[in-house]
Amino acid sequence: MKSDAIKKGPGKAAQRSLLKALGLTNEEISRPIIGIVSSQNEIIPGHMNLDKITEAVRKGILMSGGTPLAIPTIGVCDGIAMGQEGMKYSLVTRELIADSIECMAKAHAFDALVLIPNCDKIVPGMVMGALRVNVPSVVISGGPMLAGKYKGKDISLTTMFEAVGSYENGTMDEKELCDLEECACPTCGSCSGMFTANSMNCLCEVLGIALPGNGTIPAVFSERIRLAKRAGMAVMDMLKNDIKPRDIINEKSIMNALKADMALGCSTNSVLHITAIANEAKVNMNLDIINDLSSKTPDLCKLAPASNVHIENLYAAGGITAMMNELSKKDILDLDCITVTGKTQGENIKGVTVKDYEVIRPIDNPYSKNGGIAILRGNLAPDGAVVKRAAVLPEMLVHEGPAIVFNSEEEANEAIFNKKINPGDVIVIRYEGPKGGPGMREMLQATAAIAGMGLDDSVALITDGRFSGATRGASIGHVSPEAASGGMIGLIEDGDIISIDINNAKLEVKLSYEEIQRRKLKFKPIEPKVKEGYLARYAKLVSSASEGAILK
């Protein structure tokens, strides 16, 4: 056992004395020591229930003969941090979480890990940490929130952000805004649509690092507790059979995850995180593969924010295994990949059927023959940009308009709320990339305001920052290279004509070669926005969004 390094033989008597200070008996010390990595806290609705998940995992480990020891890690609520300086600290926690797992697991020689995240960056951060440590590991999330109810309709966090735009536009009064606020987020759990948290929790199933059901069983269902117990039992089986994260997450399972991403219409952040996970798994991933996979993978699901269908509906329709089974009818997935069950994906999905073909479309009658995510390239984004095609209105798939340029999210939000944006405009928000932000903030407040004001059918937004999974509309992010690295987005001026052609994967600014060269000669990036602390260090080390915004 790996834990023998801290407990076996006379030379480890001092270490055993410290383990006994924890209250452990000799018998407990002799068993495999399993680290339970929990990001439970009282500021994230999706993490407030993780203490219950931890206790269930603990019971599963004990039932299977292990000794569980819980350790903490951090987590940021993107929804609460949104629209202010605090959002710069969201993406950057992904690396801190991976680093902390590496430090704690290796320092204490854990034999195996059970990872308990739920929201946004915490999920990929834990997967990245597990790949570094590479001991048997299972991800078990806290589960999705139920959708809210208002006047007979399902609502979510997207509803709230867009309601602010409607209020500012004068189409909603304060009473209705407050009424919505009371019921939009009715339970604990990750926000109820196919936003970033649920995207990553679902894709963990497809990667094989989580048990079937991980992505869709609601947080408040007792089935979630039973799944957590099974996760504790599963990690003990993995330890017995020596199944490790790098056995599970490899090129084939990464391709499966990207294909599922297309079929589900996941958050654009999933591209960033899968790229980073691939890096930890030593898999070389080029963004160009995404358009290739998208052309071969139909969009089977249209979930919030692209519709009013939520994760609880996907759960009732059969969940991720049912969606995978539908894709398998056209041999789209590699079903020989091993998973945390000890079985292959093919064995996991055998016999699972779709229960609602309105939520998970038949493979022969998809919402779209192309997947939900697209990579755009052109002189404005030579290294790529990302758009959630599934959430773009048909009339905005091709668009040309004058640029209106901002050097921060705050400047853009002020202009939007002061009604300085006209139909046809292309909002450009720059110096919000991984290095320039720093931290690559999400522009949800801006995109939600555009939608709430009824401009999502005529206004596009491009940025070197990111978007929340709750964003909808012609919102193009991750523009690379970013402005702070001398990217073309830093050269755009008000009035330049921006050409967007999502159907043909193009993003261009209509300038002559000579004009572009003239601007490059006089270009000078703005002063760094943050000059001390963790963000300043992060800005010096972070790579481009096209590389997953990993630290180098």
UniProtKB/Swiss-Prot annotation:
- Could you say which residues form the signal peptide? none
Q: Which cofactor does it need?
A: [2Fe-2S] cluster; Mg(2+)
Keyword Oxidoreductase tagged: no
One MF term in the entry's GO annotations: 2 iron, 2 sulfur cluster binding
User: What SUPFAM superfamilies does the record point to?
Assistant: IlvD/EDD N-terminal domain-like, LeuD/IlvD-like
Q: Which domain of life is it from?
A: Bacteria
Q: Which InterPro entries match?
A: Dihydro-acid_dehy_C, DihydroxyA_deHydtase, DiOHA_6PGluconate_deHydtase_CS, ILV_EDD_C, ILV_EDD_N, IlvD/EDD_N
Which pathway does this polypeptide act in? Amino-acid biosynthesis; L-isoleucine biosynthesis; L-isoleucine from 2-oxobutanoate: step 3/4; Amino-acid biosynthesis; L-valine biosynthesis; L-valine from pyruvate: step 3/4
Describe cofactor binding as the record notes it: Binds 1 [2Fe-2S] cluster per subunit. This cluster acts as a Lewis acid cofactor.
Spell out the subunit comment. Homodimer.
User: Any idea what this protein is called?
Assistant: Dihydroxy-acid dehydratase
- The organism is Clostridium botulinum (strain Eklund 17B / Type B)
